[in-house]
Regions:
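A conserved ligand/cofactor-binding region detector
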Residues: 1-817
Length: 817
């Protein structure tokens, strides 16, 4: 954006009202006014967007393509205004027009392109890449309905389509001229050329057109604008008039429906074959389109020479979903650009890098050979050859022990195509996302690969963008921080450490706690508006917001709430500090245990919140449809940050970082990035409990853990567990929560009881909670510790993470603007 002109922006917004809605701005409703303003803001961004690309091309900058199934962007309007170099003037214009910026922001739906931490990390990374001045493109799918909109009906999660695009997205630009063909099914014929080389011809395939939609990613106050490119799918032939005229109405639109299915939802239920096939189809669809575009764009700028691609292009594979990129890049280089296998392989390995986000075996994707080879016949041929050559390398390296190694390391084995193995073998760099996670990968899950390729492995601890999670989400605290230490923290979070000197300052403590109270009041209003529950602003706001999964142990949290309720009922005479438990979580549609846990939380809430005898000492709140925009209200208000995953199971976590930055204290296990948070802030300013990762791994190996011993020997825990099956929280169906009870205590041969050691850690968790509540009542101690948490969050900026990727993996140079 060049010199900012307030009068021109004002006029443009008014003109947009007429152009888009044929009415005056004053006559528009909130949603319409949002579109009029957003279109004008997009116009302010365009010049910088074009100039960024122009400069990057002139300077021949290397570009990173961040390939991810998810981008959990939140809303764009407020973020774009904040990052623009003229954000104060823009706010003034909006107010002078009689509009309310926060109401306009609320009129924008959250972008339904992601679900959990994986997608939010990708969004934070894009913000950091643009702010740091690197040339980047995020590549994903333009989901029509996203993951789902969560409704809570009678305490149960109900999944409803999230039709976020129904009014259009004013920040996206359709780039039909850059459409790519993606092929599915069919077969491959081998043709020998005159020079003896083999050519592979894909025949009988279904063709889908991938159409890119580009949205701007605005760097903070630096005129750099990167791109998020998401792909829409369209059949080559959308309508068969011939079939229609014959009365075959379904068949007439069959191709169109097949293409449309690819982009309908994020993570379709894969409990059945059709769902599995659709997931693989989605992954290949956006990867093929993105890889083709990246290679073609590079070749066009470099006089048709593809051999130095790795010098100017980097593909970062965000988890296992995009790992088919390894084989697709090989296909493009060999089939479209006629390179030899060895030439193509060297380029591919040097271009691709893989981030592992989990040690959970079920999350490391595998595809049945029959499905993979049928849907992607040419890609399967390439994967077979990569696997054959890799197995040969293993045989040479481990002569005496080769077959045992191959059984553990092959890409294709036991009827499955293992995508994490393809990613590791086909990348020059493999990273974990927290120090503990990376060590577990090297010593446990990926040990054989680490032995073979030690130089590929490194750690890149995750981070968050302070611009979204402090400057935007908590403007009052952000202003206070700037008043104390200046504003350099906005682009260099290490500066926030300077706040530590204010931790003992009584005036600063009182200011900090007043800001926290204002944020709690805002959240209390939100809860009353959305849940109809009145919460005590002076109570502890105990927050657990994250995907619902057994290893994250939301169940342990609610069991503790049930225990507290019993204590209050048994001892009404005891002093008990008021406590508000706040949950936000979505469960995958096919994940029965997770969905039943949501029902339990809501059933417990129903009983406790309606029991007048406990005088509001406990309240339980489940925030429906947890998303970025609700996180921006919840996180600044939190007192306790619940990070209670089974040690060794959480790769990193990022809600722990967001909550820490906003002055919440961690109650958690030594897992994921918690380990590094405790190192930064000091164990005395957090509440750590439970087994270590080594202890968990040891118990898993020796299988000596017997949860029934706890049931038999701890009367209070036994009582809580019995309330799951005696109808206490479900009088209409006493057996409703039996599956949760069984998961904790079932000792049938086929099952492992209490797989995530909830009962093993429960007593320690209760003690940590008690300790935290005791400290919370010492307001001076708490204020000091809260300020120190904010002050020591500097390491956890995604800016730091990105600079590590740049230095060790991508080797990018900044764009000079």
């Amino acid at each position: 954006m060049q010199k900012f002109d307030k009068a021109m922006l004002k006029k443009e917004i008014e003109n947009n009202a007429r152009k888009l809605f044929r009415r005056e701005l004053t006559e528009l409703n909130e949603k319409e006014a949002f579109h009029a303003v957003a279109a004008a803001i997009q116009n302010q961004i365009i010049d910088d967007w074009i100039l960024t690309t122009k400069r990057a091309e002139e300077e021949d900058r290397k570009r990173v393509y961040y390939l991810s199934m998810e981008f959990l962007m939140g809303r764009a309007l407020g973020n774009n205004i904040l990052n623009l170099s003229a954000h104060e003037e823009i706010k003034e214009v909006i107010e002078e027009l009689g509009l309310n910026l926060s109401a306009l922001e609320d009129a924008e739906p959250d972008w339904a392109l992601g679900n959990g931490g994986l997608g939010r990390l990708a969004a934070c990374f894009l913000d950091s890449l643009a702010t740091l001045g690197y040339w980047a493109c995020g590549c994903g799918i333009r989901y029509k309905y996203g993951f789902f909109k969560q409704q809570i009906v009678d305490g149960y999660q109900k999944e409803v389509a999230d039709d976020w695009l129904k009014d259009g997205n004013p920040f996206e630009i359709r780039r039909a001229e850059l459409a790519k063909e993606v092929r599915f099914g069919g077969w491959v014929e081998t043709v020998q050329e005159a020079d003896g080389r083999l050519r592979f011809v894909h025949k009988g395939y279904q063709s889908v057109e991938a159409i890119p939609y580009d949205t701007p990613v605005v760097g903070y106050d630096n005129h750099i604008v990167d791109t998020l490119r998401v792909w829409d799918a369209k059949a080559k032939e959308t309508f068969s008039l011939d079939e229609f005229d014959k009365g075959n109405y379904q068949k007439a639109v069959e191709s169109a429906n097949m293409a449309r299915n690819i982009v309908e939802v994020l993570y379709p239920n894969d409990n059945h074959y059709a769902g599995k096939e659709l997931r693989l189809r989605q992954q290949y669809f956006f990867i093929s389109a993105s890889v083709q575009t990246a290679v073609d764009s590079y070749v066009k700028k470099h006089d048709g020479d593809v051999k130095h691609l790795a010098d100017k292009v980097a593909f970062q594979l965000n988890d296992t979903h995009p790992t088919v990129a390894v084989a697709e890049l090989m296909r493009v280089l060999m089939d479209d650009y006629h390179l030899t296998w060895d030439e193509a392989w060297e380029i591919t390995v040097n271009t691709c890098a893989y981030t592992n986000h989990t040690i959970m075996a079920e999350a490391l994707e595998k595809w049945p050979i029959e499905l993979f080879s049928k849907l992607l016949p040419r890609i399967y041929q390439i994967v077979e050859e990569i696997n054959r050559r890799f197995c040969e390398d293993v045989r040479k390296k481990y002569e005496g022990n080769a077959e045992a190694k191959i059984a553990k390391m092959a890409i294709i084995y036991d009827g499955q195509v293992k995508m994490a193995h393809l990613a590791i073998i086909g990348s020059h760099a493999v990273n974990g996302v927290a120090a503990l996670h990376t060590e577990i990968l090297k010593k446990q899950e990926l040990r054989d690969f680490y032995e073979m390729y030690p130089d590929k492995f490194s750690n890149k601890t995750n981070g968050i963008t302070q611009r979204r999670w402090l400057l935007h989400a908590n403007p009052e605290l952000a202003e206070w921080v700037t008043e104390k230490i200046g504003d350099r923290w906005i682009t260099d979070l290490s500066q926030i450490e300077k706040l530590a000197v204010y931790a003992e300052d009584k005036k600063a403590q009182s200011e900090f706690m007043a800001i926290k109270r204002h944020n709690k009041e805002r959240l209390a209003r939100y809860i009353f508006e959305h849940n109809g529950i009145k919460v005590n602003v002076d109570s502890v706001f105990d927050v657990m917001v994250k995907r619902l999964h057994e290893y994250k142990r939301q169940l342990m949290n609610i069991l503790h709430v049930m225990y507290l309720y019993n204590q209050i009922k048994d001892h009404p005479e005891r002093e008990f500090y008021p406590h508000t438990f706040i949950f936000g979580a979505k469960a995958a549609a096919g994940y029965k245990t997770a969905k039943l846990t949501i029902k339990l939380i809501n059933s417990v809430a129903e009983v406790i919140n309606n029991d007048a005898s406990i005088k509001d000492k406990i309240k339980v709140v489940f925030i429906e449809d947890y998303k970025v925009s609700s996180a921006e209200v919840i996180i600044p208000a939190a007192d306790f940050s619940e990070q209670i995953s089974t040690a060794s199971k959480e790769a990193s976590g990022t809600s722990n970082m967001k909550l820490m930055l906003n002055g919440a204290l961690t109650i958690g296990t030594m897992d994921g990035a918690n380990v590094e948070i405790v190192k930064e802030v000091g164990a005395e300013n957090a509440f750590i409990f439970g087994m270590s990762s080594d202890e968990v791994i040891e118990l898993e190996h020796n299988r000596s853990y017997k949860p029934m011993d706890i049931f038999n020997n701890d009367q209070e825990i036994r009582r809580v567990l019995m309330q799951l099956v005696n109808g206490f929280y479900s009088p209409e169906d006493p057996e409703l929560f039996r599956p949760l009870y069984d998961s904790l205590l079932n000792t049938k041969e086929s099952d492992v009881a209490d797989r995530y050691f909830i009962l093993k850690d429960l007593r320690a968790y209760m003690q940590a909670q008690e300790e935290a509540v005791k400290h919370f009542q010492d307001r001076e101690w708490w204020a000091r510790a809260a300020i120190l948490n904010t002050a020591h969050a500097g390491k956890f900026s995604s800016d730091r993470t990105i600079e590590e990727y740049v230095k060790d993996i991508w080797h990018l140079d900044k764009i000079e603007m």
